[in-house]
Amino acid sequence: MRIVLITGISGSGKSVALNALEDAGYYCVDNLPPHVLPELARYLAQDGQRRLAVAIDARSSASLDEMPGLIRELSREHDVRVLFLNASTQALIQRFSETRRRHPLSGSLSHDADVGLLSSLEEAIERERELVAPLAEFGHQIDTSTLRANALRTWVKRFIEQKNNDLMVMFESFGFKRGVPLDADLMFDVRALPNPYYDHQLRPLTGLDQPVIAFLDALPIVHQMIDDIHAFLMKWLPHFRDDNRSYLTVAIGCTGGQHRSVFIAETLAARLAREANVIVRHRDAPVDVDASSRLVSEVDRP
């Protein structure tokens, strides 16, 4: 059975992810107490169910300590994948404010003063981060701070499309001026490379557009940077596998996240498609949803 566990911070999009999995044919359960999970998996497997998705959050805090052991136990018999959703505190506060929902750990929030409300909400968010932190190492982390709901649904679809449970590598382009990704395991700064932004004809384009590709592809220093990063990854990916890592996020950053980082993330993703399951995501580039997050196959390899 394929089991997808969705966990992370409240307000980061767990309900959106669960709905996307339900649309994909998964039997979905929200806020399941962790200790019930093995029994539920056995029952559904006997009943012929082949896909199960479960959302687990800090409301199950009394049982969260059991999760690492449960994940290992379930992985002996099932294809278990863990998706850990995260977001910046600022983004979470804005979402709770817009939806007028109360954080599940907030207790009684005072509405007498905005400062008191935000302080209580911030404390609840930080407390939840502490509670679910041990689960982050088991899952593929995704920073949803800048993701719209439809983009997250597309990303979840790509996540479940990988064909096996081998190491998944996500190349994530981003712009430093919008902050570094919360989900990065490795980060490479490519701001030292020539910037297409200063060519007025290239400025409105992205690293997915042919004129920008031609501009960067013609520069030896760009290929040197790509070759060096690729060599580093090829050397160390086997060690990540030996450490039983299932997921690795490689962030590639330039100034705005539109030209250089996009081109380099795409190029590296295509090169590594034969070595691992690869997803490429463009956090800050103004591209459509399908282009912003996609699974890379060997046919994409140049």
UniProtKB/Swiss-Prot annotation:
Entry's SUPFAM superfamilies? P-loop containing nucleoside triphosphate hydrolases
Which molecular function term from Gene Ontology is one that the record holds? Answer: GTP binding
- Listed binding positions for GTP are D57, A58, R59, S60
The alphabetized UniProt keywords are: ATP-binding, GTP-binding, Nucleotide-binding
Q: At which positions is ATP bound?
A: G8, I9, S10, G11, S12, G13, K14, S15
Question: What domain of life is recorded for the organism?
Answer: Bacteria
**Key word Magnesium present in the record?**
no
Similarity comment text for this entry: Belongs to the RapZ-like family.
According to its UniProt entry, the function of this protein is described as:
Displays ATPase and GTPase activities.
**Under which name does UniProt file this protein?**
Nucleotide-binding protein BceJ2315_08000
Organism, scientific name:
Burkholderia cenocepacia (strain ATCC BAA-245 / DSM 16553 / LMG 16656 / NCTC 13227 / J2315 / CF5610)
